[in-house]
Amino acid sequence: MSLASYIDHTLLKATATLADIRTLCEEAREHSFYAVCINPVFIPHARAWLEGSDVKVATVCGFPLGAISSEQKALEARLSAETGADEIDMVIHIGSALAGDWDAVEADVRAVRRAVPEQVLKVIIETCYLTDEQKRLATEVAVQGGADFVKTSTGFGTGGATVDDVRLMAEVIGGRAGLKAAGGVRTPADAQAMIEAGATRLGTSGGVGLVSGGENGAGY
């Protein structure tokens, strides 16, 4: 597989304009990235600009804090799907994970899974806030809840993906779901290391630089 085929070309900043999203979509078409990952308000525009291409439209849910109710997440995900999203990247309720309430975390994931049975569901566990044991448990709970992918990070926390975290999560997943590394994938070497550790998708705002052999200094 080419590096481009791993990449969710991402722009989730609050300052993103419609023109920025159009550029993102044009870059995704040009480089044959797997998907664009954008905020929900831009879904219809991205759908139109990507028409006729193989690039998927991914969006976020409960982002970036995960601190809304499961019902709100389910509604947000369903509306995004109805608007044209192919993939949903949801954030778990991090507070429940830190409190050890894994039943609540799993119920949260299941609520979104039920709301969008046809969409690819990626579950963000926000590794920067978790111990290794919590990362293992969060990964397992996400898979049990119906995740198609478990994702390391929002890119808005205190840290992003690390090779060690990707390797740990991959061991827990054991091939039952995909694994998306996001945040901190800045060079082709970073990308390759994440893939070798077990990542099957990469979230980055610097995909063009990665496939061109350069560096992504954008931070996501």
UniProtKB/Swiss-Prot annotation:
The active site is at D89 (proton donor/acceptor), K151 (schiff-base intermediate with acetaldehyde), K180 (proton donor/acceptor). Pathway: Carbohydrate degradation; 2-deoxy-D-ribose 1-phosphate degradation; D-glyceraldehyde 3-phosphate and acetaldehyde from 2-deoxy-alpha-D-ribose 1-phosphate: step 2/2. Keywords: Cytoplasm, Lyase, Schiff base. Its EC number is 4.1.2.4. It catalyses: 2-deoxy-D-ribose 5-phosphate = D-glyceraldehyde 3-phosphate + acetaldehyde. The keyword Lyase applies. One of its GO terms (biological process) is carbohydrate catabolic process. InterPro entries: Aldolase_TIM, DeoC, DeoC/FbaB/LacD_aldolase, DeoC_typeI. Pfam families: DeoC. One of its GO terms (molecular function) is deoxyribose-phosphate aldolase activity. It is found in: Cytoplasm. GO terms for cellular component: cytoplasm. Catalyzes a reversible aldol reaction between acetaldehyde and D-glyceraldehyde 3-phosphate to generate 2-deoxy-D-ribose 5-phosphate. PANTHER family: DEOXYRIBOSE-PHOSPHATE ALDOLASE (PTHR10889:SF1). Belongs to the DeoC/FbaB aldolase family. DeoC type 1 subfamily. This is Deoxyribose-phosphate aldolase. It comes from Deinococcus radiodurans (strain ATCC 13939 / DSM 20539 / JCM 16871 / CCUG 27074 / LMG 4051 / NBRC 15346 / NCIMB 9279 / VKM B-1422 / R1). The gene is deoC.
